[in-house]
Amino acid sequence: MPASRTKKAPSTHVPAAGSAREKLIAAAIATVRYKGFSATSVDEICQAAGVTKGAFFHHFASKEALAIEAAGAWTDIAEQRIFTQPDWTRIPDPLERLLGHIDFRLSMLDGPAEDFTCFVGTMVQESYNSSDPIRAACDASIRTYALRLAEDIQQAIDIYGIASGVSAVSLAYHIQAVLQGAFILAKANGNPVIARDSVMHLQRYVIMLFTQK
């Protein structure tokens, strides 16, 4: 039986400063990560953002339109918080940098699932068959992440080689698949430990690919 835990309000910070549009995007990301896209209403997003419903429809024609723009904003957040700011990005050796990336993702798996789960991964699980524009926006965000990570993987392959049949892009997508699956396991189990175990297995697998050529 999944471990139980006390539910709380969305914990992702919605900035007090910024335009109404920025507040709505931040509120959408926080609320969808907490309760899912379908269960999130425009009224809840407006309340979390501290703006009126009129302001919402001034900036966005629909909840779907906001979701699409928020997916792009999520891509920008990932670029800064995952690929630019952390110390692992400055490790000189590309293989060590790749392993540093996985270590960093492992370190993020703590606390309630809404604090570490993927916004676009959450949305696309619900909307892949009901909103093609949302599906495409989520795909673009996930693809951007994979291609960004593939740059480091390719540099590591160029230096160390890799197991036969493995490309940088395919491995980057596999890393994404493990992470997204780990988020789902943590949500189902109610505990991030199971997700951490999955990412630790991922790290062992990546090391094996570069040592068993």
How would you label these PLM feature ranges?
Residues 1-19, 157, 212-213:
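N-terminal intrinsically disordered/low-complexity leader segments
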Residues 2-4, 23, 27-65, 69, ...:
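Helix-turn-helix
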Residues 69, 83-116, 168-175:
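Hydrophobic alpha-helical connector segments
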Residues 92-96, 136-141, 158-174, 193-197:
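All-alpha amphipathic helical-bundle segments outside canonical DNA-binding/catalytic cores
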Residues 97, 111-136:
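Amphipathic alpha-helical segments used for helix-helix packing
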Residues 108, 175-193, 206-213:
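Amphipathic C-terminal alpha-helical segment
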Residues 116, 121, 166-185, 201-205:
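Hydrophobic alpha-helical segments that form the core
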Residues 129-134, 143-171, 208-213:
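Hydrophobic alpha-helical bundle segments that form small-molecule/ligand-binding pockets
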